[in-house]
Amino acid sequence: MKCPRLLTRILNARKTLTYGLLLLVLGGILGLKSLGHHTASQLECNSITLPAEQTLPGAGALRIAFFSDIHNNAGLFNETIAHIEQARPDLIIFGGDFVVAYQRFMRTSWAVEGLRRLSAVAPCMGILGNHDYEKQEQVERVFHTAGVPLLRNGAVDWKTPAGTTLRIIGLGDYNEGDDAPERCMKACGQEEHPVLLLAHDPESRWRLRNYDWDFMLSGHTHAGQLGNPFTGTYISFRSSMPAGCYDFEGGRRVFVTRGVGSILGMRFFCTPELNIIELK
């Protein structure tokens, strides 16, 4: 009689252990998901100061608000606008991916109103990101209605607060095969003005190495949405420039933002950000 009882106890113990492990795994998954959603909601406004003459030679002192990768997140977009209104920049740049390719983008009044608020602060312009091409007509209509230009292989000459001319060039998306630098850029050494280049993916810099530009602003990477909590670095499998300011050939610089939104609404040790870039 002892053997069946012992066997029953063993089976019950195994069931208890199995259920316990399942609950532990489930709790871990839910906890991880909660952490990811929480981190993705913690928008930071980060400032960086760069020497003007080594970044945009001849442009003079300048304050640029730069944000990218909204990914249809109206709440974080409103937070971004509030930070920018407080910072009072001279120029506002959007680096692409206003939407998410797999989400609907139908009720767009929040986007139009937000872009209009930004335009009331300072001159504002942007570019398309790879996700935007899935909803290109809607995105372009939103920006047009708000009066904010989207540069797609085009350039504008903008008068800086110092009275100098800054050439701002915006490219179509590199990953979508829509970038055409030959339409709007000159060969190295041919530009008469400092050039601020807007390109959604920082990896496109290699294609642009023989064109004349000084400072490139990019997004796209989200800094991998994953950070190393021990080193403070970011883990990205698709870019050698996940986030921050990098030196490039010919004394040029590339600045990559971590972005505002995120894919699947989760980040780990990698908070979203907008950037205030001070050139002094």
Where are these regions (language model features)?
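N-terminal membrane-anchoring alpha-helices
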Residues: 1-58
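Beta-strand-turn-beta hairpins that frame and shape the catalytic cleft
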Residues: 51-65, 148, 156-170, 247-254
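Membrane-embedded segments
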Residues: 58-151
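Binuclear metal-dependent hydrolase catalytic cores centered on His/Asp/Glu-rich metal-binding motifs
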Residues: 141-149, 154-155, 160-199, 205-206, ...
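Conserved beta-sheet core of the metallophosphoesterase superfamily
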Residues: 202-276
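Mobile, glycine- and charge-enriched loop segments
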Residues: 40-75, 169-202
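A short C-terminal boundary segment appended to hydrolase-like catalytic domains
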Residues: 3-14, 19-22, 206-210, 264-280
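Active-site metal-binding loops of divalent metal-dependent hydrolases
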Residues: 66-72, 96-99, 130-132, 154-155, ...
